[in-house]
Amino acid sequence: MSEERGVAAVAARGLFKQYVGGDGGVIHVLEGVDLELRAGEAVAVIGESGTGKSTLLHILGGLDRPSAGEVRVGEDMLWRLSDEALTHLRNRRLGFVFQFHHLLREFTAVENVMMPLLLAGIGWAPARERSRELLARVGLDRRFEHKPGQLSGGEQQRVAVARALIARPVVVLADEPSGNLDPETGERLHNILLEACRERGAAMVLVTHNRELAARADRVLRLEGGQLLPAHAAPL
């Protein structure tokens, strides 16, 4: 990679992932996947269910280890880090948005968003102020003190998006973030997520089944046969 282009926000090289099935056979999920994203770039990954899209995201986020290959976030090779250093990197430099929001139900919207900042050692008052500002940015300025059970599904996912972005991650990994939402709410959520990542200069990998929403990303790739291909490429 040239110095002129600089260091990628996240880069994967030669990723393989295999599992042993119940019958003892080997299941090949990823077969030499390469992927590189620059700061502020959004890449959508589409593909049939069971092709390994979520597995790829988990490996990029340091939540699962590849059978072979490497992942780099900035200058850091994930699998050369200690467990403590890897946890620190995930908390400070990566943001995760899943299909299920995983909000803490006993805490308010603003308290859920504050959590990453509090874990990073930021004081309560500045963490709360930053969280309120970001919740307002995603259209929840009247929902600061509502708990998840008092919010709609779309509102809960917007809280999850704010939580993913609050620590200003360099990479956001989003796995079907609108999968449980109606089309209109899902489209609104995707727009918020894309705009917020671009404004903050965060790279984003978005897994989605919705080709119309995927088309709004800078690139669209298809995971098929264990490989990432341009979405318009002929099937393997």
Language-model features: locations:
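H-loop (His-switch) and adjacent beta-strand-loop-beta switch element
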Residues: 220-232
